A protein has these predicted regions:
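Active-site rim/loop-helix segments in enzyme catalytic domains that contact anionic ligands
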Residues: 1-114, 144, 250, 257
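Metal-dependent de-N-acetylase/amidase catalytic core
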Residues: 1-11, 85-86, 97-272
Length: 272
């Protein structure tokens, strides 16, 4: 029996985040007929590494509005590579990542609009401040969206599940206190080229058809996540809430011939 289409909302603290940590999963859900929306609360200027490097070198103030537009277009283009056309960019400043009530309200508005069954976002204690703050605001927005909000026509809504990225934000001692063992592993082997194309749209952060960065990270991060599942590429997630069953489930979906575990498909990927 076919399941009903789901509404999936991915939230990243910066424009690249949802793509690098869940882009393959997003593409899989689109292919399954689900509605996928990606949301970025900030303009992401603090992570425009190309502009930051140039400014450090020449000390000439760039056109900040042009840089913000560039970052926004990259996210739109990257999402399109995955088949995602519903891209929400709230455009708030990310220089000092703090919880902002207005952003919480706006995230709650998006929740009320798309009524997600699933939200995918960063781990709550991710050591990148913009990641952790985005998740804190997301959880607060979920609380707000679950009740009656004066002046809002959205029905109260609570997603069935939240999945946190099971990858480290940075390599530092803070991350040692966070579980990175996934409760769910999504086989993204069939969508790994789509994810590579999406990541190569992020030229402001060193990606692109002429850069080896995506091939390196794709094999290192997504390849590593698939090892114990005996699949070439995967994305890992940690469920926020326990799932309820009448009997214990055994999920066999996605099992592959273990001989393909070491396939390195990105060696053959030809960027456009």
């Amino acid at each position: 029996m076919a399941r009903k289409p789901l509404s999936v909302l991915t939230i990243g603290g910066h424009p690249k985040d949802a793509i690098i940590d869940s882009g393959g999963t997003m593409a899989n859900h689109v292919a399954a007929g689900d509605r996928v929306t990606t949301l970025c609360p900030t303009h992401g200027l603090s992570h425009h590494t190309a502009a930051i490097a140039k400014y450090k070198a020449d000390r000439k103030m760039p056109d900040l509005e042009a840089l913000k537009s560039e970052l926004a277009q990259e996210l739109v283009d990257a999402a399109a590579e995955l088949g995602v056309t519903d891209v929400r960019i709230l455009g708030h400043d990310d220089a000092i990542p703090v919880v902002v009530p207005q952003i919480i309200e706006e995230i709650a508005d998006v929740i009320g609009d798309v009524l997600p069954d699933i939200i995918i976002t960063h781990a709550p204690y991710d050591s990148v401040p913009g990641h952790a703050v985005a998740t804190e605001m997301t959880l607060l927005a979920m609380e707000a969206a679950s009740g009656i909000r004066p002046g809002k026509n959205y029905p109260p809504h609570k997603p069935s599940q939240v999945f946190f990225h099971a990858v480290a934000g940075r390599t530092n001692v803070q991350e040692t206190n966070i579980s990175r063992v996934p409760t769910h592993v999504v086989d993204i082997t069939d969508s790994v080229y789509k994810k590579a194309a999406a990541m190569n749209r992020m030229r402001t952060q060193g990606y692109g058809p002429d850069s080896p960065q995506q091939r390196k990270l794709g094999e290192a991060i997504d390849g590593h996540m698939g090892i114990h599942a005996r699949i070439p590429y995967a994305e890992g997630f940690i469920a926020h809430n326990p799932s309820v069953y009448t009997t214990l489930p055994v999920v066999i979906e996605g099992e592959r011939d273990p001989s393909h575990m070491t396939d390195m498909l990105l060696d053959n990927y030809k960027p456009q």
